[in-house]
């Protein structure tokens, strides 16, 4: 799903629904890529040893492709503006235990939203004698 926000014209959003992980495990990874340039965020996800980074990288790559193909943004200027997750369904399973009892197994699902923004390069000030 691609949405272009109405307030700011240079935002691109990508949503990945039904990721098989809890929000508790996703949040630290998503907080780590916010504010970084896109290539640095992909590098960080590549070298992380968490299993869920593969799905987050897939969502980030989708957002980059949307920005490049649908909105003709330059990849070098893209920055991760927001990255957050939300709860989805929790699939419940039961495991047989001793004496006829059962233990509940929770299998949580989450959705991930990544918002990219195009950051224009600012002009560097020319250094004068007084300034």
Predicted regions and their residues:
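A short, conserved strand-capping beta-turn/loop at the end of a beta strand
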Residues: 85-97
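A generic structural micro-feature
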Residues: 72-74, 95-97, 104-109
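Short beta-strand/turn micro-motifs at beta-sheet edges
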Residues: 16, 101-103
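Ribosome large-subunit tunnel/peptidyl-transferase-proximal elements
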Residues: 2-85, 111-119, 123-131
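Short beta-turn/strand-loop junction motif enriched in small, turn-promoting residues
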Residues: 65, 99-101
């Amino acid at each position: 799903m691609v949405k272009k926000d109405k307030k700011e014209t240079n935002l691109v959003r990508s949503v990945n629904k039904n990721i098989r992980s809890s929000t508790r495990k996703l949040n630290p990874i998503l907080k780590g890529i916010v504010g970084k340039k896109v290539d640095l965020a992909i590098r960080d996800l590549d070298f992380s040893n968490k299993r869920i980074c593969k799905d987050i990288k897939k969502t980030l790559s989708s957002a980059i492709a949307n920005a490049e193909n649908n909105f003709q943004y330059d990849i070098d200027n893209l920055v991760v503006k927001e990255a957050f997750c939300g709860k989805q369904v929790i699939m419940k399973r039961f495991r047989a235990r001793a004496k006829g009892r059962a233990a509940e197994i929770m299998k949580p699902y989450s959705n991930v939203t990544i918002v990219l923004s195009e950051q224009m390069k600012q002009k560097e000030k020319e250094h004068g004698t007084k300034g």
